[in-house]
Amino acid sequence: MSMEIHVFFSGLPPLPLAVTKAMEQLGLDFAISDPDSGFELGGFMPMTNGSGMGAIETGTEVYLGSAKEMIDALGIEGIDPKLEHEISFRWGSDFMEGACAIALSVAIAKLTNGVIWEDSSGEVLSIENAVEICHEMTAAGKRQ
């Protein structure tokens, strides 16, 4: 079973370097492995947790699409219709991959004033709540 989290936003997706810096500013120890990559192509995005010899190689699946199409497909209500783009992050049972997905979603939401939608709970997550969940998943991933 896979899990998924979405960010609804307007404008262009932020550059990976800006996303990595935002994760750092939020206290999330993740980095996008290829700062020249983009979100437009989709697929697996390699990342690291930590740095140096103790860095953990990980990542998550990334898909970019239309906010309206995703909102309609999921039957979500209450999302501002001015938010035109959607980026989703998908992972399986690996907690560290889930932590990557949440770290990316928090950073992108912060950079774009976007809205984080968590599929399994069917609710909007605040930046603060998502950061807390990311820390919990990171700790669980290190024990996995």
Report residues per predicted region.
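Acidic (Asp/Glu-rich) sequence patches and key acidic residues
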Residues: 1-144
